[in-house]
């Protein structure tokens, strides 16, 4: 197998959908027995280090779809609105694969607005 350069890998990733990239990351973590959650652990350790860190307000949120509820079609429509470039099939897979992060690293206002839209559509949502 020919060795791919970093640029070739990046170009291949650009052509993948969000769902495909998510599945790739999960498989990568399993094959190499690593986790992409290290930054979260570092942030948690930093917050435990002092009162100043605890006083800071969190400015980035992940909007996590816990359950689509009974009105799955409405939730799929809202997910397509929130995630740009997401096709119907990808949105459906994302909703059916709950719990899944819909938005990652969103500011507080966007995260709360997305949560409100999803809950209005009948979904159960958490902010992390």
Curated annotation (Swiss-Prot):
Listed InterPro entries: Ribosomal_bL12, Ribosomal_bL12_C, Ribosomal_bL12_C/ClpS-like, Ribosomal_bL12_oligo, Ribosomal_bL12_oligo_N_sf
Name of protein: Large ribosomal subunit protein bL12
GO BP terms, alphabetized: translation
Oligomer status and interactors: Homodimer. Part of the ribosomal stalk of the 50S ribosomal subunit. Forms a multimeric L10(L12)X complex, where L10 forms an elongated spine to which 2 to 4 L12 dimers bind in a sequential fashion. Binds GTP-bound translation factors.
GO molecular function: mRNA binding; structural constituent of ribosome
Cystine residue pairs: none
Membership in a protein family: Belongs to the bacterial ribosomal protein bL12 family.
Function: Forms part of the ribosomal stalk which helps the ribosome interact with GTP-bound translation factors. Is thus essential for accurate translation.
Swiss-Prot/TrEMBL keywords: Ribonucleoprotein, Ribosomal protein
One term under GO cellular component: cytosolic large ribosomal subunit
Pfam short name (any one): Ribosomal_L12
Species per Swiss-Prot/TrEMBL record: Corynebacterium efficiens (strain DSM 44549 / YS-314 / AJ 12310 / JCM 11189 / NBRC 100395)
């Amino acid at each position: 197998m020919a060795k791919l350069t970093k640029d070739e890998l990046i170009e291949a990733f650009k052509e993948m959908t969000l769902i495909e990239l998510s599945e790739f990351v999960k498989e990568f973590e399993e094959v190499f027995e690593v986790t992409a959650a290290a930054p979260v652990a570092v942030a948690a350790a930093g917050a435990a280090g002092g009162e100043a860190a605890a006083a800071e307000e969190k400015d980035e949120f992940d909007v996590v779809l816990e359950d689509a509820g009974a009105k799955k079609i409405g939730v799929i429509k809202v997910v397509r609105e929130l995630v740009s470039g997401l096709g119907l099939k990808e949105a459906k897979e994302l909703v059916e694969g709950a719990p899944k992060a819909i938005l990652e690293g969103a500011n507080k206002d966007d995260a709360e607005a997305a949560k409100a839209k999803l809950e209005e559509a009948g979904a159960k949502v958490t902010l992390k």
